[in-house]
Amino acid sequence: MTTTLVEGSVWQFDLGMVNAYLIDDGEVTLVDAGTPRSADDIRSRMAEIGYEPADVDRVLITHYDLDHVGGIAGLDLDAPIYAREPDASHFEGSASPSPTNRKGLFQRVVGVWVTRPDEPVRRVEDSIGGFDAYATPGHTAGHTAFVHEELRTALVGDLVTGDDGALSTPPLPMTKDPSRNAESIRELAARELDVDVVAMGHGDPVVEDGAAALADLARRVG
């Protein structure tokens, strides 16, 4: 299912177990790309709203997990990929997640199904295009939230989950450092972002008063 979050600019691709997002602010950005089986689905969702993979100008990766980077290879994109360290290195295969915690061990095991990008992943720091890039470590060490204030939209990956307008923390077993993730939630909320939409990797995006929903979660995890 494809859902319009901001008319003419932001779309959610519900890929079943995970979401990806397409943003058009004059440049076309794909945020995350599902599993290795998601590529055809993403291509179909793009076609529904008048796009094709060749239209994508950049890919932003909120974090390195199979269900967020797996579909990129199958899209045959001619676009740079951006991620924060160390997740960028984990995706391109120049470094591996630590096997000393459950999250890293799981990433190493399922990493055999990840097709590495042909070109080096570009490192994102503070911003890219119309997006501010905020470090939100916890779920993974290099987790990043991408915020487009002009479109009043925050794309937060697995920092949170969503259910019927409310936000929750991600499942503890699949989060590298739950305490640090909670701290990242508080830090992002403290920025008092001027956003309506909070769009996450798993669950239903918040489409009204997203900043308030994030602040409410920050109080609950405080």
Model regions: which residues?
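Haloarchaeal acidic low-complexity proteome signature biased toward cell-envelope/secretome components but also
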Residues: 1-11, 39, 59-60, 96-104, ...
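Conserved beta-strand hairpin/beta-sheet module of binuclear metal-dependent hydrolase folds
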Residues: 2-48, 145-162
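Short glycine/proline-enriched coil/turn segments at helix->beta-strand junctions
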Residues: 25-27, 75-80, 129-132, 149-152, ...
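Residue-level marker for buried hydrophobic side chains located in beta-strands
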Residues: 29-31, 60, 81, 153-155, ...
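Metallo-beta-lactamase
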Residues: 36-37, 87-135, 141-216
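Active-site metal-binding motif and surrounding structural segment of the metallo-beta-lactamase
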Residues: 39-83
